[in-house]
Amino acid sequence: MFTILPRNVFGAMGGDKKYVAPSDQLTRGIIGTGGIGMSGLHFVSDERCRLVSVCDVDKNHLDNALKKGVEKFGTKLQAYTDWRDLVHDPNVDIVHIATPSHWHGIMAVEACRAGKDIFCEKPMTRTIGEGQKVVEAVNKYGRIFRLDTWFRFKDTFYGLGTTVEPLKKLVQSGLLGWPLTVRISGATGFTWKFYWTGKENLVPQPVPAELDYDMWLGPAPY
């Protein structure tokens, strides 16, 4: 005769942090482990979701993600170089798409076909047509698609001390009058775009040995 005791009886989780059994957790895989993808590596505040795999066509990015995974979770993540392998991994419930935008539509549709829910970085797709295909796939396969417009759900929308919902209601109420003047400035922390775009006569460079350029390019013409 034996007795099964709950894990919390042994004080496995301290304080008020609630323990969630692995069988009750959703699992997540990240495609693209560059800057944005690596930020997704730190989504560990909710015990109901667990990162299990990462994918990248850049060996340096992938190795860094695996290293950070061990540091963060104390376990080795499953590594992929082909996104299709991650999408069809039966151990993955949610696919986090953090690749260049020319891949978003194709990956999202295939993830739906594979029975996965999707968390996709901005922009959703490059074109309206691609976006419509994603919507069709989500509806056809009954999946959940979430676009990462996360500032709309922050407690302080761009430092205004509130979420975007009451601001939207305020504008729609007409209390501020019409028309409104909207002033836009460069986003802090993304100034590299100002120096990278619009350059001419760039010197061709060889493809880095650690990068699978054909897979990175995918459906893009160049």
Q: Could you describe each region identified by the protein language model?
A:
Residues 1-120, 129-144:
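N-terminal glycine-/serine-/threonine-rich beta1-alpha1-beta2 phosphate-ribose binding loop
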